[in-house]
Swiss-Prot record:
The lineage of its organism: Bacteria, Pseudomonadati, Pseudomonadota, Alphaproteobacteria, Hyphomicrobiales. SUPFAM superfamilies: Peptide deformylase. It comes from Rhodopseudomonas palustris (strain BisB5). GO terms for biological process: co-translational protein modification; translation. NCBIfam families: pept_deformyl (TIGR00079), PRK00150.1-3 (NF001159). This is Peptide deformylase. Removes the formyl group from the N-terminal Met of newly synthesized proteins. Requires at least a dipeptide for an efficient rate of reaction. N-terminal L-methionine is a prerequisite for activity but the enzyme has broad specificity at other positions. InterPro entries: Peptide_deformylase, Peptide_deformylase_sf. Its cofactor is Fe(2+). It catalyses: N-terminal N-formyl-L-methionyl-[peptide] + H2O = N-terminal L-methionyl-[peptide] + formate. Belongs to the polypeptide deformylase family. The gene is def. The keyword Iron applies.
Length: 175
């Protein structure tokens, strides 16, 4: 495993649309391992491969760790897609490792049905709700070049982007 640098807004690579993974290879498994290590180090509960400058449709998540009970449930999702969503919506305060120290309420479907491939090459479908639903939607957005701030008003989004552009010009590094 290797710790990888997480790219930060305004890095243009965050807007790239990630390419599908053709097959689960040892390289994809190694990338997932690197992503888990980088995600835990940050610390975070979800990471899309594009956030470490790898434009492939791979997500790692461990929402159990957020609860701080010492437990862990690391999961990897290859080529994840939302195949159904509830009409009911939830609002959750979101943050992002690529937009450090900024949090905002985002409204998303309360329940989504996802289809993905696991690290063993098995295609699976399952329903996600609560934090799992919010996190998987947030990470799938990354794979499509969408950031959580894109769900905010135009004014709020512009303020956040401007803040990070100024920080980048000044050479401010978020750690």
């Amino acid at each position: 495993m290797a710790l990888r640098e997480i790219i930060i807004l305004p890095d243009k690579r965050l807007r790239e649309i990630s390419k599908p993974v053709a097959e689960v290879t040892p390289e994809i498994r190694k990338l997932a391992d690197d992503m888990f290590e980088s995600m835990y180090d940050a610390p975070g509960i979800g990471l899309a491969a594009i956030q470490i400058a790898e434009p492939v449709r791979l997500i790692t998540m461990d929402i159990v760790r957020k609860e701080g009970n010492g437990k862990s449930d690391p999961r990897a999702f290859i080529n994840p897609e939302i195949v159904g969503a509830s009409a009911e919506m939830n609002v959750y305060e979101e943050g992002c490792l690529s937009i450090p120290e900024y949090y905002a309420d985002v409204e998303r479907p309360a329940v989504v049905r996802i289809r993905y491939t696991d690290l063993d090459g098995n295609v699976k479908e399952e329903d996600a709700d609560g934090l799992f639903a919010t996190c998987i939607q947030h990470e799938i957005d990354h794979l499509d070049g969408v950031l959580f701030v894109d769900h905010l008003s135009k004014l709020k989004r512009a303020m956040v982007v401007r803040k990070f552009e100024k920080a980048a010009k000044r050479g401010i590094k978020y750690v």
